[in-house]
Amino acid sequence: MTPREAIRLLQSEIVQVVGCTEPAAIAYAFRTLVRHLPRKPDPRSFRAELRISQDAFRNASTAVVPHLKTRGILAAAAAGLASRADSFNVFADFDLRRARTFMKNSAWLKIVPVPRRGLFVHVQLPGLRTGITLEGRHDHVEKLVLFGEDRTPREKPLPKPPTLGEVFKLARKRDPQLEALALDFITRQVPAEKGFSLESQIARRISGRMSG
């Protein structure tokens, strides 16, 4: 694996997001879908069905949606419908009042847990032949159908994950761009602790996670 391939692979995995990823995936599915509709959904008439894997259902049901400060799938979907973001970071910018309007009446959303593991989110708009499926990665659009037309974005295949031997080779190369990406990610993930070097902070974080 080359440093360029490693950077591309890492960049596909490092996605900035406010809040937990399962609710964000639900919101992202709704946001992506309604962006392609000819007009904004009307809270009085909009209807949707959400089919979601057991793992995602469990995690999204207990996570709090930022700004709304409310747990659950309905809040995530409502935030997605009210989001102004075009990226996976859907909770970073949304119309709070509009989201609360969708939350007042839960009848518009039918939630169907399905016996699947991992990440699977499918949103269907009844009667419109319009739907979206996220699967695998939280931001990966597996299928997008708009009024019966397949509009699935075509992504360039990612490199295969490196073997342990390739990881060591990459580390020995000390590629400046790869190291800059890693440092940026680490410093975002590790909170500053006075009196400890960055290396010590990283070790403390790893130790804490490994010990639960």
Role assignments for model-derived ranges:
Residues 1-5, 21-28, 68-72, 76, ...:
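Conserved active-site and cofactor/substrate-binding residues in soluble primary-metabolism enzymes
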Residues 104-212:
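Signature of multi-pass transmembrane helix bundles
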Residues 5-18, 181-185:
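Generic N-terminal amphipathic, Lys/Arg-enriched alpha-helix
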Residues 1-7, 43-56, 210-212:
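Acidic-glycine-rich active-site phosphate/pyrophosphate-binding loop
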